Amino acid sequence: FAAELDESDGTIVKYAPNVCVINNLEPDHLDFYKDGLKSILETFEKFISNIPESSVVLVNKDCKATMSLHSHKTLTFGMEDADYTARNVRFMSDCTTFDVYYKNEFLTDLTIILRGKHNVYNALSVLASLHQAGVDVNLVKPHFATFSGMGRRFQKVAEFDGVTVYDDYAHHPTEIKATLSSAEGMNDKRVIAVFQPHRYTRLKNLWNEFLGAFQGVDKVVVTDVYAASEDE
């Protein structure tokens, strides 16, 4: 089975998967990780050290932090010079297509109906995981073209009077940038972002990053902070 592991409270170290994907690491959950990225990397190093030597760890080649992790068997995925590489990426109005190479050998081509560069990384890492698990990639390829995404991940929730409304749970500056990039090129209309900050600690510690996350947006509306049990 497949599962998404949550690193927010450090309990990720309790798990020992056969195939593990670490997409990217940045300062977050700073209410728990008091030393920021340093603490996060220490937790992930402990997590990796606990998994069996036969396990495969797939890390994002384009993320400096993930590339600093050490494992018994590490493979990389990314846009260039990785074990699994996405090449010839084409963003179109209704889909995204790209070719997948494994160790510079053509493996397959993929079509996804999700937008944004981050979803290329997501799909690439999923395919790499399946390939490492011994699954025939040509058998699973058609399913990538029909997966419409998760709820609250650039989810279309309404359309009226020429306005299209999308809902996304992004609450980290990098996530916000990725979400807003999904709207680029969709049409020539204005992009209005309504943002509710999540946790006072995150807003305080990543303030400068938040200021730069909305560049290119026509209008930003900021609501009250969702405290998530924190005191103001």
Regions found by a protein language model. Give the residues of each.
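Glycine-rich nucleotide phosphate-binding loop and flanking beta-alpha elements
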Residues: 9, 28-29, 64-66, 201, ...
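Switch II of P-loop NTPase G domains
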Residues: 8-16, 173-183
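Short beta-strand segments
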Residues: 2-4, 23, 60, 194-196
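Short, flexible loop segments at the rims of nucleotide/cofactor-binding pockets, characterized by
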Residues: 3, 32-38, 169-170, 197-202
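Active-site beta-alpha connecting loops in nucleotide-dependent enzymes
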Residues: 150-152, 174, 180-232
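A short, aliphatic-rich alpha-helical micro-motif
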Residues: 14, 48, 214-215
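Switch II (G3) loop of P-loop NTPases
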Residues: 1-8, 165-171
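Acidic, Mg2+-coordinating active-site environments of NTP-dependent enzymes
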Residues: 17-165, 188-189
